[in-house]
Regions:
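Residue-identity detector for glycine
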Residues: 2-5, 17, 24
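Short, positively charged and aromatic/hydrophobic N-terminal segments
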Residues: 9, 14, 36-38, 43, ...
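Conserved nucleotide-cofactor-binding alpha/beta core module
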Residues: 154, 158-198
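Non-catalytic C-terminal accessory region of glycerolipid acyltransferases
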Residues: 190-328
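Membrane-anchoring hydrophobic helices of lipid-metabolizing enzymes
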Residues: 42-133, 146-148, 155-157, 168, ...
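Ala/Thr-enriched low-complexity intrinsically disordered regions
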Residues: 25-29, 41
Length: 328
């Protein structure tokens, strides 16, 4: 879910100046109600459901706090583009829920504020009920697929954690499931990732980082980084491969291709992801969980990068053969 980082930071540097240290150097307690700023990473850590109103994400206020002057018509245009009203309605409807319960309600709930997606799950028995497995999969959608993965794995394990862009902490119902990755501070991001891999939790992980793109006529992930292989070996985590059978609309892929042809590095097609999320409303997609791959498999026969590519290829084989065995 790393690419759903289109949401602006809610608090400006000016806000930090009005805060005081609490508990030594670990946190800053701010005057704003129920908000704690964790030094360099902004985290909403203690929001009571009663404090969540119908307009929880207030784009106008966010822009003002960031000292961005924008005409009202521009704000309205951004609100429509980012589907702020719909996201707020989902947050408000499910404000009493948290963790896996929030993810399941938002993904499968039939209320108009939710997505009402029908999940078709295969291989849930392949998720170990004990130990510290790492569920690794493709990332076709950039949002609802991650929520659906939490929903699905949460039927077997209650201890799931997901490393995500720290902006996603502004979805209060999900924050307890996240390891927030600070995209600005690389050293802090690496430390948080290390903490996630070292934890005893069931870890959900998208090795591509970004959601899938159209490549040679097929929707596939970009390169899978080898980090998950190295950490699986270091922390003795068996890998559960997971294939999600879904895709965004063609306009997302066309915009991504146009950006690439123009030589633009910034992935501005990300701004379409909220619309793509709601385009999944009422649809069905499947998630297939393959047989666990023991961490001891990843030996010196191949480099970590080669192992990562082999696991990626195996994940895509699950589409046609859910019972496929990983071939080293």
């Amino acid at each position: 879910m790393g690419e759903v980082g289109v949401w602006p930071i809610l608090f400006s540097d000016k806000d930090k100046g009005r805060c005081q240290r609490k508990n030594g150097a670990k946190t800053l307690a701010c005057e704003k109600k129920s908000v704690i700023l964790h030094l360099e990473t902004y985290r909403i850590m203690d929001i009571n459901p009663s404090e969540i109103g119908p307009k929880f994400i207030d784009l106008q206020r966010i822009l003002e706090q960031k000292r961005v002057k924008a005409p009202r018509w521009v704000v309205r245009m951004l609100e429509r583009l980012l589907h702020i009203e719909e996201i707020n309605s989902g947050i408000y409807l499910n404000r009493e829920l948290s963790g896996i319960d929030f993810a399941r309600a938002f993904v499968e709930g039939k209320e108009p504020q939710n997505l009402g997606i029908e999940l078709k799950l295969q291989g849930l028995d392949n998720i170990p009920r004990e130990g510290n497995p790492m569920v690794v999969g493709n990332h076709p959608l950039g949002g609802p697929d991650g929520l659906a993965l939490m929903d699905a794995v949460g039927r077997v394990r209650s201890d799931i954690k997901f490393p995500v862009n720290d902006f996603l902490l502004y979805l209060p119902g999900l924050r307890e499931l996240f390891y927030p990755i600070d995209k600005v501070n690389r050293s802090k991001a690496l430390a948080t990732l290390e903490e996630a891999f070292a934890s005893p939790n069931t870890l959900l992980y998208y090795p591509a980082g970004l959601c899938s793109r159209l490549q040679n006529g097929q929707v596939r992930d970009l390169e899978w980084k080898a980090t998950f292989i190295k950490k699986a070996v270091r922390y003795q985590r068996d890998i559960v491969p997971a294939y999600t059978d879904a895709r965004n609309r063609m306009r997302f892929y066309r915009l991504a291709r146009l950006r690439q042809r123009l030589g633009i590095k910034f992935n501005f097609e990300m701004a379409l992801l909220p619309a793509e999320m709601y385009a999944q409303r009422g649809k069905a997609f499947g998630i297939t969980f393959g047989k666990p791959i023991p961490w001891q498999t990843f030996d010196k026969r191949h480099t970590a990068a080669e192992w990562a590519q082999r696991v990626k290829d195996h994940v895509y084989r699950l589409k046609d053969n859910p019972d496929a065995t990983f071939e080293p």
